[in-house]
A protein has these predicted regions:
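Sec-dependent signal peptide recognition
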Residues: 2-10
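Hydrophobic h-region of N-terminal signal peptides that target proteins for export
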Residues: 10-18
């Protein structure tokens, strides 16, 4: 009986530890290299020089444009992830992970953000090597967000 339990546990462990099946079509669609990774550009949005000056309706309009821009970039496949930082002592406000291979291409996108144009945010860009699966976040997020 004990040997049967050991055998069952061993087989269960082997099933858990089995390598996942490689999906060549998915890897190609997401632009993955042989490690399942790809180059992105990481953008840190920081508090800009005009942040404190923009108030009321003007601020609301800038942020409405900021969020619309995020949605557009995500829908176009140019943005893997975006989101705000919690309170911190670095003036970091948010991040973007752009699905573009160069800093120059990312800069062309970030300067279109209404909050950057208005001086609410300034930005820093750097190349970042991460999982190509990052490109599945937007679709998954849409299934998690409750409709308004």
């Amino acid at each position: 009986m004990m040997k049967a339990v050991q055998l069952c546990l061993s087989l269960a462990f082997l099933g858990i530890a089995a390598k996942p099946e490689f999906d060549a079509e998915l890897a190609k669609r997401l632009g993955a290299d042989e490690r399942g990774m790809k180059m992105y550009v990481l953008c840190i949005l920081k508090t800009g020089p005009k942040d404190a000056e923009l108030k009321g309706k003007d601020r609301d309009e800038v942020f409405a444009g900021h969020f619309a821009n995020i949605g557009r970039l995500a829908d176009e496949g140019k943005l893997a992830v975006a989101g705000p930082f919690g309170k911190n002592d670095r003036s970091w406000r948010g991040l973007y992970i752009f699905n573009v291979p160069t800093v120059e291409e990312a800069e062309k996108l970030v300067v279109l953000d209404p909050a950057v144009k208005a001086g609410v945010f300034v930005y820093e860009l750097t190349p970042w090597y991460g999982s190509a699966a990052m490109m599945t976040v937007t679709e998954t997020h849409k299934r998690l967000q409750k409709p308004k």
